[in-house]
Amino acid sequence: MNYLFWSLPFLVIILLFVFYFGKIMLKVLPPKVKNYHLIYWISLIILIGFNIYLRTPLMGFLIYFTLFHMIYDLLRLLSYPFKKVNNFLKKLNYKEYPILVISILFTLYGVLNAMHPVVTSYNIKVDKQVDEPIKIAFISDLHLGTPYLNENFQNLIKTVNEGNYDIFVLGGDIFDEWTTEKEKEHFFEILKEIKTKNGSYYIEGNHDVLNEETYQKYTSSGVRVLQNEVLLIDNKYYLVGRKDKMTREVQGLEQMLKNVDMTLPIIVLEHQPTSVKELEENKVDLSISGHTHGGQIWPANYFVKYGYYDNGYSKSIISSGYGEWGMPIKTTYHSELVSITIY
């Protein structure tokens, strides 16, 4: 049932791709052979399906080509009672060139943006005594196997090692359904190069498969896997790692924090953002999460959370992730390593 639930939206999107792209190309390409309509539509479905499977940047182009055509058609429909405006819009998209050019520009920007991750820094003041600043390096949503990521991950290791961080956190969705075993093995070898004062930590995401084998590989790479656990780090602050909500095994914060010293800072790590109400009720100083990708594809960023939130007592940081899912483009926020200093 869940498979059907998630498959239907993708099927609708693919049909929209085929409809808009096919409709335009049938205008541009003259008929050359018998039954060319049927041949063309079948070929187009195969082409789009092939690019979805390979996760190429063309997927981004198809999304924007379809989206801008839908917006254009909606404007034409709304302006129908106003003949001059309607005629202007009709002339504006001369032979589809404007929408074609805009779609290409959005796609190129998304590719370049995905290729160049940035360091996003936050300085967080908490309402508890912090004798020395706590420095955290956090990444999530690598989705290893996405193009550009292998080289970027080498640069990431260098950045973390030069940053003099207290801890390094992997915030889930490190792998996904497309990650190969070779890519996983390479990743675990690179993880061994991470150097921080108090170690590296991992929480699982909704795309991760945390079986016994994967658990052991993280451990062998020097990474502590947190599954509904509370750790006291260096006798200075608590690190709370929760299982992902999709596992249906996540514990409530009230239960997890019942034996902690509430005079010390409490930092909650969870792949999907925790509810503000639960954070506030349990006096959590900071929660760090990912999952949303910052929307990844404009205008999805208007419908998800990203960045820093002051909830009152507690603070939240939601990362856009270090990688991309589904296709190697990002037209919303940058791919990022989140650098946090708590004082």
Briefly describe each language-model feature range.
Residues Y64, H69-Y72, Y122, Y201-Y202, ...:
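Aromatic side chains
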Residues K128-Y343:
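Soluble catalytic domains of enzymes that build or remodel membrane lipids, polysaccharides, and related
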